[in-house]
Swiss-Prot record:
The keyword Transferase applies. Keywords: Isoprene biosynthesis, Nucleotidyltransferase, Transferase. It comes from the Bacteria. Signal peptide: none annotated. PROSITE patterns: ISPD. This is 2-C-methyl-D-erythritol 4-phosphate cytidylyltransferase. Pathway: Isoprenoid biosynthesis; isopentenyl diphosphate biosynthesis via DXP pathway; isopentenyl diphosphate from 1-deoxy-D-xylulose 5-phosphate: step 2/6. It comes from Frankia casuarinae (strain DSM 45818 / CECT 9043 / HFP020203 / CcI3). GO terms for molecular function: 2-C-methyl-D-erythritol 4-phosphate cytidylyltransferase activity. HAMAP family: IspD (MF_00108). The record marks 161, 214 as: Positions MEP for the nucleophilic attack. Residues 234-251 have a biased composition (Basic and acidic residues). Belongs to the IspD/TarI cytidylyltransferase family. IspD subfamily.
Amino acid sequence: MGEGHRLPVASPRVAAIVPAAGRGERLGGGTPKALRALGGRPMLVRTVESLRRSRLVTQIVVAAPPTLVDAVAQLLGGDVYVIAGGAERVDSVRRALRAVDDDVSVVLVHDAARPLTPPELVDAVAAAVLDGHPAVIPVVPLADTVKEVDADGRVVRTPPRDGLRAVQTPQGFRRDVLSAAYALEDIAVTDDAGLVEALGVPVTTIPGAQEAFKVTRPADLVLAEALLARCDPADDARSAEARSAEARSEEPQFAGARSTDARSGG
C-alpha cells in the first residue's frame, strides 16, 4: 500500500511515535528486534497495545522496516499509521514526525523494545507535557555504581549515584520543540531528550516504572517472559509455543525480514 496506512482520527492532540525499523543485533536472531516474539506475540504488538490503552494518546505512528511496511500494518491494525523507517533511529523519528497529524500538539517517542511499559506511565508523561512542561522524560534510580573510564579502560572518576538516573520512554515533547530539535544537524545524542537539551530547552523528569525496561539482550527477553508469566499464566504457554516455533524456523512469521535496509532505525 505504498507510503503508509492511515485511518482518520478525530481531533488528535497527543501522538505517539514508535521507531521500529532497527535490527537489534545485540538481541541475536535474524528477525528485527521489534518483531521478536514475547509471550507468543511480537514485542511491537505489545508495545502498541500499551499505547492504545493510554487515555491521552490519540494517534500512533510506527516506523517499520521498509520491506515490511505492509506486513506490520496488517499486524497492528488499521488504527495505527505505519510508515517506512530510515537507516538510523533519528531518520525514523524524523519521518514519523512528519507523518503526525497537523492538529497534534504533544508528541511522545517510545521505544518499540519496551513492551511492558504501563499505560499509566504513558499518560503521566503526556499529562506533564499538556500541563506546560516542554519536554518530559521518565526516569528510575540507578541500582549499580557508575564509573567514568578513559580510552584505556582506567577509571577517571566515580560520579555520585544520588544525582544519576536511568532514562526510559516514552519521552514527551511539545510538538514545536521536538520539530526544532530534529531540525538540528550533526548532533550526536542517544535519546530524543538529548536533542532537546541541545536547544537549551529544560527537560523535566517524572518517576518511571520498573516494568518499562528495554529488551536489548537475551537476558532481558528472559526477564520479560518471566514477568509476563507471573502476570498471566496463559502468556507462559504462548511463550513455550513461540520458542518451539522459533526452534523450527528462525523467522517463522517474517521470512523477508533479512532483506530490510534499515539496520539500526529503531
